[in-house]
Amino acid sequence: MTHWITLLAVEKVAKEGGLFDLDATLPLMAIQFLLLALILNATLYKPLGKAIDGRNEYVRNNQLEAQERLSKAEKLAEAYEQELAGARRQAQTIIADAQAEAQKIAAEKVAAAQKEAQAQREQAAGEIEQQKQQALASLEQQVDALSRQILEKLLGADLVKQR
């Protein structure tokens, strides 16, 4: 029985209104919707859009600034690396020059020491030769003196003087 009451109520409503009634509610709802859209636009959408646009601009500026700083840092790093490589090459050149100079000085000192040693050897050989000659001369005199003494003892002093 309750179903019959519900069906009768539905039939009565369906006969009266149809799809919708054209009265003052529809234009009033449209005005309310437009008014709500204007209020929301003024109070929410425009400030929110401005905030989003400001944030996008801030992010874009920071990104551009970061890219500029990165490129400057890369350029500075490259310049530093080039300067460092130049300094290394210069240091290697200085080291090589110093080593060559040290070898040259060492070779000169060795040559001078060899010359000095050779001169000392020659001087020592000369002194030895001179002492040898003096020793031979001294020995010759001693041999002559001894020979005379022997002859004097053997032959006598008078015979040796006649000769």
From Swiss-Prot:
Listed name of the protein: ATP synthase subunit b'
Keyword Thylakoid attached: yes
Subcellular location: Cellular thylakoid membrane
Keyword Transport annotated: yes
The family this protein is said to belong to: Belongs to the ATPase B chain family.
Gene Ontology molecular function, alphabetical: proton-transporting ATP synthase activity, rotational mechanism; proton-transporting ATPase activity, rotational mechanism
UniProt cross-references to InterPro entries, sorted A to Z: ATP_synth_b, ATP_synth_B-like_membr_sf, ATP_synth_b/b'su_bac/chlpt, ATP_synthase_B_chain
UniProt keyword annotations, A-Z: ATP synthesis, CF(0), Hydrogen ion transport, Ion transport, Membrane, Thylakoid, Transmembrane, Transmembrane helix, Transport
Known function: F(1)F(0) ATP synthase produces ATP from ADP in the presence of a proton or sodium gradient. F-type ATPases consist of two structural domains, F(1) containing the extramembraneous catalytic core and F(0) containing the membrane proton channel, linked together by a central stalk and a peripheral stalk. During catalysis, ATP synthesis in the catalytic domain of F(1) is coupled via a rotary mechanism of the central stalk subunits to proton translocation. Component of the F(0) channel, it forms part of the peripheral stalk, linking F(1) to F(0). The b'-subunit is a diverged and duplicated form of b found in plants and photosynthetic bacteria.
Cellular component aspect of the GO annotation: plasma membrane-derived thylakoid membrane; proton-transporting ATP synthase complex
Source organism of this protein record: Nostoc sp. (strain PCC 7120 / SAG 25.82 / UTEX 2576)
